């Protein structure tokens, strides 16, 4: 019986929340205000696997679904750090097996976000945000992390 119910479930296309909102719902406006400067965190997975933005190593016009969605939020200022899609160093087991390298990559990424003057680092990948939040806490930096869904939903 369970086999019958599960038949065809593998064919269901799974989408990341920003991909779904951007490509399927396609909002033209949001009744949300967030009067803050945010620095956009483009995760490796989001850029290179999910296509949430165009990777800098390809010679194509720049597009970014997260930036598009945040552009619908009133009063927000969106900036991006230098080397906007360089890895933050988390990468799952990489952070465990190469913790010193992972930590330095994360510090470098966080400092590039800090250099933008943003109050928040905003992204769609919880693991990247968690990694950077740990660095922010250890270094005592004056910047916070937020998942983009918190802003888009107005639940900040």
Predicted segment positions?
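Single conserved hydrophobic/aromatic residue that forms the stacking wall/gate
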Residues: 2-13
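Local cysteine-cluster metal-coordination motifs and their immediate loop/turn environment
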Residues: 41-50, 83-98, 122-134
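Basic- and aromatic-lined ligand-binding clefts that recognize polyanionic substrates
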Residues: 25-74
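Iron-sulfur (Fe-S) cluster-binding segments and ferredoxin-like electron-carrier domains
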Residues: 50-63, 93-104, 130-141
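A mid-sequence, solvent-exposed acidic-amphipathic segment
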Residues: 60-95
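Short, flexible loop segments at boundaries between secondary-structure elements
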Residues: 11-29, 83, 137-156
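A short, acidic, amphipathic alpha-helical segment used as a generic capping/interface helix at domain edges
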Residues: 101-117
């Amino acid at each position: 019986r369970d086999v019958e119910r599960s038949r065809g479930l593998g064919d269901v296309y799974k989408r990341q929340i920003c991909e779904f909102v951007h490509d399927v719902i396609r909002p033209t406006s949001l009744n949300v205000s967030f009067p803050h400067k945010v620095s956009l965190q483009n995760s490796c997975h989001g850029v290179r696997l999910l296509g949430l933005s165009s990777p800098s190593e390809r010679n194509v016009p720049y597009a970014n679904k997260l930036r598009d969605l945040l552009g619908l939020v009133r009063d927000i200022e969106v900036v991006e750090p230098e080397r906007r899609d360089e890895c933050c160093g988390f990468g799952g087991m990489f952070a465990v097996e190469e913790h010193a390298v992972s930590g330095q990559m994360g510090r470098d990424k966080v400092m590039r976000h800090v250099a933008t003057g943003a109050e928040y680092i905003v992204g769609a990948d919880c693991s990247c945000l968690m990694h950077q939040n740990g660095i922010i806490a250890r270094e005592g930096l004056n910047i916070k992390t937020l998942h983009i869904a918190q802003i888009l939903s107005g639940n900040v």
